[in-house]
Amino acid sequence: MIYYVIALFVIAIDQISKWLIVKNMELGTSIPIIDNVLYITSHRNRGAAWGILENKMWFFYIITVVFVVFIVFYMKKYAKTDKLLGISLGLILGGAIGNFIDRVFRQEVVDFIHVYIFSYNYPVFNIADSALCIGVVLIIIQTLLEGKKTKE
């Protein structure tokens, strides 16, 4: 199924990018891409977004396995008839597994995309995080559009 290919693509790009960061950058160093907007910054996270639940690896292992099983089940049941849902779930699955790999093999997640949005120093993130967020946003958009169609 194409949605699993999307997940594998996300995992591959995520892991390759993280490997490049670990091998080529000292922890804490930063390379400006667009001054005051976008940087590549070598960072590690032992928790979830914004460092929430730091050092609770077993919690993340269990939650991720349950979540991945749920996503695969949901993909098998609903993605056959809904392409956008399948793409969204493929992105979410790839992102979840990408960060899970880091937690299992590194006991931390490698983050490196550092963005300043209107001078707000946004937490450093990675490709897996981006895929998760894009997948969730697509599901929200689809849900809103379907709700609008139902009302009409």
Curated annotation (Swiss-Prot):
UniProt membrane topology term: Multi-pass membrane protein
Top-rank taxon, per record: Bacteria
UniProt GO MF annotations: aspartic-type endopeptidase activity
BP-aspect Gene Ontology terms: proteolysis
Subcellular location: Cell membrane
Active-site feature positions: D111, D129
Keyword Flavoprotein annotated: no
Enzyme Commission code: 3.4.23.36
Catalytic activity: Release of signal peptides from bacterial membrane prolipoproteins. Hydrolyzes -Xaa-Yaa-Zaa-|-(S,diacylglyceryl)Cys-, in which Xaa is hydrophobic (preferably Leu), and Yaa (Ala or Ser) and Zaa (Gly or Ala) have small, neutral side chains
UniProt key word Transferase: no
InterPro entries hit by this protein: Peptidase_A8 (IPR001872)
Pathway where this protein functions: Protein modification; lipoprotein biosynthesis (signal peptide cleavage)
Main location: membrane
Pfam families reported in the protein's UniProt record: Peptidase_A8 (PF01252)
Transmembrane segment boundaries: 55-75, 85-105, 124-144
GO cellular component terms listed in the entry, alphabetical order: plasma membrane
Entry keyword set: Aspartyl protease, Cell membrane, Hydrolase, Membrane, Protease, Transmembrane, Transmembrane helix
Family of this protein: Belongs to the peptidase A8 family.
Cited function: This protein specifically catalyzes the removal of signal peptides from prolipoproteins.
NCBIfam families reported in the protein's UniProt record: lspA
Protein name (Swiss-Prot/TrEMBL): Lipoprotein signal peptidase
Species annotation: Bacillus anthracis
Lineage: Bacteria, Bacillati, Bacillota, Bacilli, Bacillales
